[in-house]
Structures are given as C-alpha cells and as structure tokens.
Amino acid sequence: NIITGDDAAAGRYIEARLSNFALDVVFNPKTTEWKLSYDGRNKEPIALPVKFPLLLAQGAEGIAVGLNCKILPHNLGEICDAAIAYLHGQEFHLYPDFPTGGSIDVSKYNDGQRGGAVRVRAKIEKRDSKTLAITEIPYGKTTGTASKPSTFIDSILKANEKGKIKIRNVEDLTAAKAEILIHLTPVASSDKTIDALYACTDCEISISPNCCVIDDRKPCFLTVSDVLRNNVDTTLELLRKER
C-alpha cells in the first residue's frame, strides 16, 4: 500500500489475469515474442509489447550491478498528450505526478536525468486553530502500520522533541486516504507550525530521479522525453504488425 506501507501478499497467494484493457493495450499474439518455459513444455512471453509508456506511468526503482534507477510516475493523460504532440512534431514537456498527492516543484527536474531533483510537499490543512491535518503525503513516504512504524510520523515527533515545533500529540486516522492529525499546544501558532513542519520534517523532501533503462539489451541513461519518443516509435511499429 503506497499510503500505509503495508506489504503485498506473498507471491504464492497472488494470481494475475489480464483485463480487457490490458489484452488490447499490453498483449497481442501477433506482436508478442515467445520463448520456451523453464521445462520446455510451454511457451511464455519474452516481454509484453505495451502500446503506451507504462514505465513512465507507474515509475520504477531498483539497483543492480553498480547501476541504480529511479523513474518517477507520470500522469497517463499527460503522457498521451505528450505522445500526440510528438506525433505532430510539436514540443512537449513531461513532469512527475504522484499517486500520494502533495505539491511538487519541478523547476530542477532536468527531464528525469541524473543530477535533477524535485521537491515534494505534503498537503497540510487547518481543521481549527489548534489542529492541523495532513491529507496528502510526499511520494515515497508512508503513514506506517503497527509492524512497520512510519519514518514520516517519526520525523514529526523528533522535531517536537528537539523543540522545532510545539505539539501535544499526533493522531493517525489513515484509511483509504491519508489523514494525520497534529494537535498543537495552547501556545503554538498554526501558521508557524506549518512552516516548521515543511522546514524540519519529512513534510517536504527532495527526490533525485535517475532515468537508467535497458535499451537494445544495454543499460543507458535517457531523459523521460527520450523514453516517450522511443515508445511512440515502437508503438507505430506494433500497429503496423497488427494489420
């Protein structure tokens, strides 16, 4: 769970079935390359030829053999608009869009390349003069569970211990959506506390992207715009094969 941090069920309990959308967009027997399964009795896809840049839509993160990758998620509608602009020979720009919400500063995004960075802020609301509510959290942070405490909430408690903010307690009411209530002390200012939360806790964080992908069986560093262009070109080839 991207909000609470709950782990997925064990692999032996998970079964996947392609939806009608996936059958149309992700899988096609005419364009899918196959190989023998581990025992040679069946065939399995080498890769599913997706007709849109799924990598940019859901993002990816990992590290292996001295290379690390961190591709941030993007809005599917904006990806489609950018693809249409590319087909028309027009300029386009792609910026991250996080499922956990919050606001984002993309001025140094650098098209997803190494050396770029984005700043992400939680959404903090005033419920009353002595109660603040965090309803959207920065991407990559979680509200935590009983077995996996939240470093996000811990950062608020530690700031209080150091005297950076003055709060009575933190109440986590997260369910389908994030909801963390921060109850202030009688002498605390809500406006100053919000400023301090952004300055001294994980309510504001910096994320550094690194668009490292496998292209032609070799790792390479691309921009997210390059990934989109490559995907559009590949999709055109797939559509020609389907005819």
Residue ranges and their predicted role:
Residues D6, D39-P45:
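Glycine-rich anion-binding loops of enzyme active sites
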